[in-house]
Amino acid sequence: MRNTISSKMGQVLIVLLLLCTVLCRTESALPSGQHSVLLTGRRLMGSGASGPVRSSQSSQAGGRFNDADPIAIDYGKY
C-alpha cells in the first residue's frame, strides 16, 4: 500500500515538473513586445462598438441591406 502511494506521488511530481518546464519555455519563447500587443487587443475587444453601423460601413463589410432581415442587428440600440 505504501509503495503505490509513494509511486503515485512520484509520478505527480514528475508531471508537475514537466508542466512547469513547458510553461516556462513557452513564455520565454514569446518576444517581449508580444505582451503589450495582446493587452492592446484585449482592450480593443472589450471597448465594444461606438454607435450604430452606417450603411456605407455595412456594405463594405458585406452586410445586408434589408431592414426586415432578422440576422441584421443594429448594435447601436443596445
Curated annotation (Swiss-Prot):
Superkingdom assignment: Eukaryota
Upregulating conditions: Triggered by AtPep1. Induced by Erwinia amylovora, a bacterial pathogen. Accumulates upon infection by generalist herbivores such as Spodoptera littoralis.
Locus of motif SCOOP motif: 50-64
Signal peptide: 1-24
Cleaved propeptide residues: 25-43
A Gene Ontology BP annotation from the UniProt entry: regulation of reactive oxygen species metabolic process
Span list, region Disordered: 47-78
Known tissue expression: Mostly expressed in the whole root system, and, to a lower extent, in seedlings shoots.
One of the record's GO molecular function terms: receptor serine/threonine kinase binding
Keywords noted in UniProt: Apoplast, Cell membrane, Cleavage on pair of basic residues, Jasmonic acid signaling pathway, Membrane, Plant defense, Secreted, Signal, Stress response
Effect on the protein of changing residue 58 to A: Impaired seedling growth inhibition. Loss of MIK2 binding and subsequent association with BAK1/SERK3, and impaired MIK2-dependent seedling and root growth inhibition and altered induction of reactive oxygen species (ROS) burst
Cellular-component GO terms for this entry: apoplast; plasma membrane
Disulfide bonds: none
Effect of gene knockout: Enhanced root growth leading to longer primary roots due increased differentiated cells size. Increased accumulation of reactive oxygen species (ROS) such as superoxide anion O(2) and hydrogen peroxide H(2)O(2). Reduced susceptibility to necrogenic bacterial pathogens (e.g. Erwinia amylovora) and necrotrophic fungal pathogens (e.g. Alternaria brassicicola) infection and pathogenic induced cell death leading to the reduction of necrotic symptoms in leaves. These symptoms are associated with disturbed expression of various genes related to stress responses.
Motif SxS motif essential for MIK2 binding location, chain numbering: 56-58
Subcellular location: Cell membrane; Secreted, Extracellular space, Apoplast
Role according to the record: Brassicaceae-specific phytocytokine (plant endogenous peptide released into the apoplast) perceived by MIK2 in a BAK1/SERK3 and SERK4 coreceptors-dependent manner, that modulates various physiological and antimicrobial processes including root growth prevention, phospholipid signaling pathway activation (e.g. accumulation of phosphatidic acid (PA), but transient reduction of phosphatidylinositol 4,5-bisphosphate (PIP(2)) levels) and reactive oxygen species (ROS) response regulation.
Subunit structure: Interacts with MIK2 (via extracellular leucine-rich repeat domain); this interaction triggers the formation of complex between MIK2 and the BAK1/SERK3 and SERK4 coreceptors, and subsequent BAK1 activation by phosphorylation on 'Ser-612'.
Family listed: Belongs to the serine rich endogenous peptide (SCOOP) phytocytokine family.
Name of this protein: Serine rich endogenous peptide 12
Gene source species: Arabidopsis thaliana
